Regions:
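Flexible "cap/lid" loop of the alpha/beta hydrolase fold
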Residues: 105, 111-144
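Conserved HGGG/HGGXW glycine-rich cap/lid loop of the alpha/beta-hydrolase fold
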Residues: 12-62
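Conserved acidic catalytic loop of the alpha/beta-hydrolase fold
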Residues: 71-88
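Alpha/beta-hydrolase fold catalytic core
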Residues: 1-24, 45-48, 85-86, 157, ...
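Conserved alpha/beta-hydrolase catalytic His-Asp/Glu region
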Residues: 125-132, 145-210
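Catalytic active-site module of serine/aspartate enzymes centered on a nucleophile-bearing elbow/loop
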Residues: 242-274
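Short beta-strand/loop motif that positions the catalytic acidic residue
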Residues: 212, 218-220
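Acidic catalytic loop of the alpha/beta-hydrolase fold
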Residues: 223-227
Length: 274
């Protein structure tokens, strides 16, 4: 079921409201709630309550006047209020993992657990020149008049494991999961993509890691070049009691590449702790 309330982000959900755990899926910079529809359905079928949001500015959610991680976490808390979720297990992929860490800093009382997947506690380098170069490189196609579909054409093959796509694959040759990832990225409004990139390079929550006191899983993809396994492993070491798992044969788009191992890892974690 899709919800689009006034004053809060839109989300989809399924599953019983009295479930032993409520999972909230948070997508990345090129995603949307539709990318987690199968995850919502899967966990609801196992009697968990599951939600997936459209981050502000994405899909059915209105854009924020200023897209910052602080404001994104506030929007997430507002969605939890409207959805009547007291405590949630946040499952954040890529930029969504950063939103989850920011939410821990701002409203830890609303968080029962964390799954940080293919993400990082800070942008790669805090050097201003590096940030500007990163943003310029990512925005160059849009600045040259390319569409988000053309951005997806170029980016997605660089974010998956070797052999996940045939060399030079056309969209018609994409496996179903990666075709979904392509559709999600293609649908991101260019203005939102620009604003998200500017926020991304300013993200910094490394100091929050030792304060995390809820069950946490740091989930890596073996072939992820965007958030390499070593980044996730080191993050887990800085969180008391955190678990680390690396999904063999997968890249940055782990759940889109093969959803079964992603679901299995999250399910094992949830069953252990909730």
């Amino acid at each position: 079921m899709m919800h689009r309330p006034e004053g809060a982000p839109a989300w989809i959900e399924a599953g019983p409201k009295d479930a032993t755990a409520t999972l909230v899926f948070l997508h990345g910079i090129g995603g949307g709630k539709k990318g987690f529809q199968s995850s919502v359905d899967y966990f609801a079928s196992l009697e968990y309550r599951a939600l997936a949001w459209d981050m502000p500015g994405y899909g059915d959610s209105l854009a924020l006047e200023s897209l910052t991680f602080k404001n994104l976490a506030q929007s997430l808390e507002k969605m939890l209020d409207v959805a009547q979720v007291n405590k949630a297990v946040l499952v954040g992929h890529s930029m969504g993992g950063m939103v989850a860490l920011q939410a821990w800093s701002q409203c830890p009382e609303r968080i029962a657990g964390l799954v940080i997947a293919a993400s990082s506690p800070a942008f790669g380098q805090q050097d201003g020149d590096f940030q500007q170069q990163f943003v310029a490189q990512r925005l160059a196609p849009l600045n040259a008049g390319k569409t988000m579909t053309q951005v997806a054409d170029k980016l997605i093959p660089t974010m998956v494991a070797p052999n996940a796509l045939p060399v030079g694959a056309t969209l018609a040759q994409y496996p179903e999961g990666l075709a979904l990832a392509h559709a999600c990225m293609s649908a991101v409004p260019p203005a939102t993509y620009r604003a998200s990139l500017q926020a991304l390079v300013k993200f910094e929550q490394r100091s929050a890691l030792p304060t995390i006191s809820v069950p946490t899983l740091c989930l890596a993809g073996e072939h992820d070049k965007t958030a390499p396994p070593e980044v996730l492993r080191r993050m887990a070491q800085k969180i008391s009691g955190a678990e680390y798992e690396c999904l063999a044969g997968l890249g940055h788009l782990m759940g889109f590449e093969k959803e079964a191992p992603f679901h299995e890892a999250v399910l094992k974690f949830v069953r252990r702790h909730f």
